[in-house]
Amino acid sequence: MRKGDYMVISEQIRMLCAKLNISKAELARRLGQSPQNLNAKLKRESFTIEELKKIADVTGVEFKHRFAFASGEEI
């Protein structure tokens, strides 16, 4: 799902799971939460920056958050 020209975080998390060949249930287990809780967060798009950092940590990737202009400039 896309909103405007950006990908919503839930889609990024689903793509991350697919690329790592892990289920959302496995991600939830690694995060120490129930699959139902993770699915609810994905549905609501309700992740804190700290939760996103933890997702990155438990999956071995780097989380980068920044503002990006249409020109490609990021801050």
Question: Residues of each region from the PLM?
Answer:
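DNA-binding alpha-helical recognition surfaces that contact promoter or target DNA
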Residues: 15, 29, 40
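Alpha-helical residues within the helix-turn-helix
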Residues: 18, 29, 57
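Recognition helix of helix-turn-helix/homeodomain-like DNA-binding domains
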Residues: 32-47
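Short, basic-rich loop-to-helix N-cap that marks the start of a DNA-contacting helix
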Residues: 44-57
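Short C-terminal boundary/hinge segments that cap the last helix of small helical domains
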Residues: 60-75
